[in-house]
């Protein structure tokens, strides 16, 4: 049952990430038949902030998932030990 909650949580986070992702459009800065001389303009701030937040979010999810997995493994080991002894 806990695995179902984990999968549901990951699915919700995935959908929210897609919904709140910044929209990106390619815009021509010059005439397509102009010379090869030009300049490049980049806006890396938006991508860097979005990626950093996503990394923290994935880190938190990974910690929770590891905690849940550790609890499940401990419970399974305790049940096996109880079966072996009793």
Curated annotation (Swiss-Prot):
It is found in: Secreted; Target cell membrane. Residues 27-52 form a propeptide. Expressed by the venom gland. This toxin is detected along the entire venom gland, as well as in the venom reservoir, the venom duct and in the venom. No toxin are detected in the Dufour's gland. GO terms for biological process: defense response to bacterium; killing of cells of another organism. The modification Leucine amide is found at residue 85. Pfam families: Pilosulin. Residues 1-26 form the signal peptide. GO terms for molecular function: toxin activity. GO terms for cellular component: extracellular region; membrane; other organism cell membrane. Keywords: Amidation, Antibiotic, Antimicrobial, Cytolysis, Membrane, Secreted, Signal, Target cell membrane, Target membrane, Toxin. It comes from the Eukaryota. Negative results: does not act directly on human Nav1.7/SCN9A voltage-gated sodium channels. Toxin that may interact with target cell membranes, producing a concentration-dependent leak in ion conductance, possibly via multimeric pore formation. It produces an immediate sharp increase of calcium concentration in all DRG neurons. This influx in calcium stabilizes without resulting in any observable dye leakage, showing that the effect is not simply cytolytic. This toxin may be one of the major contributors to the pain associated with envenomation. The toxin also displays a weak cytotoxicity (on HEK cells) and some antimicrobial activity (MIC=2.5 uM on C.neoformans (var. Belongs to the formicidae venom precursor-01 superfamily. This is U-myrmeciitoxin(01)-Mg1a. The lineage of its organism: Eukaryota, Metazoa, Ecdysozoa, Arthropoda, Hexapoda.
């Amino acid at each position: 049952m806990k695995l179902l909650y984990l999968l549901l949580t990951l699915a919700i986070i995935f959908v929210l990430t897609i919904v709140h992702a910044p929209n990106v459009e390619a815009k021509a800065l010059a005439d397509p038949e102009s010379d090869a001389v030009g300049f490049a303009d980049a806006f890396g701030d938006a991508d860097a902030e979005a990626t950093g937040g996503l990394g923290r979010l994935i880190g938190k999810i990974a910690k929770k998932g590891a905690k849940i997995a550790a609890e499940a493994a401990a419970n399974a080991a305790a049940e096996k030990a109880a079966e072996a002894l009793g």
